[in-house]
């Protein structure tokens, strides 16, 4: 009986920790103001769960850093936006995550807000695939 309980606990632990932060395929909308439309492209980004906690008693000396699923490494890829005006720059570079980890959110390169615009937001009504 103890062996069965051990295996149940082990698989529950594995399901929680191993299915955490990982690369995920997403579709994002890219746009340029000069082109006046959006296109959808596929890329990879980090998504998942990280072990975190919110302390009941806040300690002003020790900051409470929440861990989030974020990129560890990424590269930029470039796409040519079709239909732009001749004088407009039609090249658009976007990030592609290559590795993920649980860490603090880097506000210099990432939208860390709870209610961001989202990857499919488009300023223009017309969208091209």
Swiss-Prot record:
Residue pairs linked by disulfide bridges in the UniProt entry: 21-69, 35-84, 38-122, 46-100, 50-102, 105-112
Glycosylation sites: 25, 42
Signal peptide per UniProt: 1-20
InterPro entries attached to this UniProt entry: Cystine-knot_cytokine, Glyco_hormone_CN, Gonadotropin_bsu, Gonadotropin_bsu_CS
Subcellular localization(s) per the UniProt record: Secreted
Top-level taxon in the UniProt lineage: Eukaryota
Alphabetized UniProt keyword annotations: Disulfide bond, Glycoprotein, Hormone, Secreted, Signal
Pfam families: Cys_knot
Cellular component terms (Gene Ontology): cytoplasm; extracellular space; follicle-stimulating hormone complex
Gene Ontology biological process: follicle-stimulating hormone signaling pathway; G protein-coupled receptor signaling pathway; regulation of signaling receptor activity
GO molecular function: follicle-stimulating hormone activity
Quaternary structure, from the entry: Heterodimer. The active follitropin is a heterodimer composed of an alpha chain/CGA shared with other hormones and a unique beta chain/FSHB shown here.
Family membership noted in the UniProt record: Belongs to the glycoprotein hormones subunit beta family.
Described function: Together with the alpha chain CGA constitutes follitropin, the follicle-stimulating hormone, and provides its biological specificity to the hormone heterodimer. Binds FSHR, a G protein-coupled receptor, on target cells to activate downstream signaling pathways. Follitropin is involved in follicle development and spermatogenesis in reproductive organs.
The protein's name in its UniProt record: Follitropin subunit beta
UniProt source species: Trichosurus vulpecula (Brush-tailed possum)
Gene field: FSHB
């Amino acid at each position: 009986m103890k062996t069965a309980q051990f295996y149940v606990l082990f698989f529950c632990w594995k399901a929680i920790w191993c299915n955490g932060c990982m690369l995920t395929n997403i579709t994002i909308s890219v746009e340029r103001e000069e082109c006046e439309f959006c296109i959808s492209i596929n890329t990879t980004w980090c998504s998942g769960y990280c072990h975190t906690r919110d302390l009941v008693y806040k300690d002003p000396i020790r900051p409470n850093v929440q861990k989030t699923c974020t990129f560890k490494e990424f590269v930029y890829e470039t796409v040519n936006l079709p239909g732009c005006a001749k004088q407009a720059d039609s090249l658009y570079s976007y990030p592609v995550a290559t590795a993920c980890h649980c860490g603090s959110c880097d506000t210099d390169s990432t939208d860390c807000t709870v209610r961001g615009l989202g990857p499919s937001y488009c300023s223009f009504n017309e969208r091209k695939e």
